[in-house]
Amino acid sequence: MEYSQMIFRGLFITKLSYSLTCFIFFIYFNHSNAQNKILEEINSPVIFKGDERTAYRDPAVLFHNDRFYLFFTLVKNESGKIFSYTACSDSSDLRKWSQVKILTPRDQNLNYCSPGNLIRYDEKWVLCLQTYPRQGYNSGDKVRYGDANSRIFIMKSNDLENWSNPELLKVKGPTISEDKMGRMIDPYLIEDKDEEGKWWCFYKQNGVSMSYTYDFINWNYFGNNESGENVCVLKDENEYTMFHSPSNGIGIKRSYNLKDWNSFGSLITLGQKDWDWAKGRLTAGAVVDLRNIKGIEKYVMFFHGSGPNKETEGDFDKNSSIGIAWSSDLVNWEWPNK
């Protein structure tokens, strides 16, 4: 090979390598930059807006493969009757969401709703939820809550798209029949922080009640603690952090052993005083810890707000919306357009 040809090839390879390096850096930079702006580019704290015939409530969130999967209660006024469903939508940027998909049947005697959270168990996704029977509940009736037959269930999926039929969780133990379990709502599942394979179910009954299992079939009742509803529990180092909803706002408690709980911080009400859509009540905080996700690096909270009227005044099955906020420390919270 002539010397001039060798020089030419060397220059060509050098330029090609440089171009590839620049291209890879460009792709990485733009991806990272886009990730960094996910929270900054949300232009409204409202993710799903309710109206006079629709309510979005009780959010549950999963962050998986760079996507947010949001599950929630969808309440609809259909032909003068009020129905509750479990529904879902997903997004990569928290601004553009997929079409809402209803996962549960239209049946006032069941009203599957209030999804708590999703876990990964036995190579499947598991979603916990409740029934909320309100048979004969019509538009214009006084606000009615789920009756004494409200129970908690799980559904399973391989792909987050197709779900099994709901299965009852007999969280009071195998010897307690379904009709003796008592009214229970708002389930949440979490693996024990110290014992792998031991799973806890938190649910609203006598404050917050707790049961545990090793197989999701045989359950042991553990006890209860003073708490509001819509419990969400995170494991943070050697501690459990529980978010719960009293009559208004979102409270936080912490515990090392699930028996002794101490209040943490102040009641969280975010921008409620300035939000007509949440002036009636702000509640049901579902928090996901994304501090280790590059470009997000926050706790992200989804919640629902009802308004402008109080829920007892009618804005329970209508005019309820899902909102978003985030924090680095669970004390100071930010939201779009703050």
Say what each PLM segment does.
Residues 1-35:
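Bacterial Sec-dependent N-terminal signal peptides
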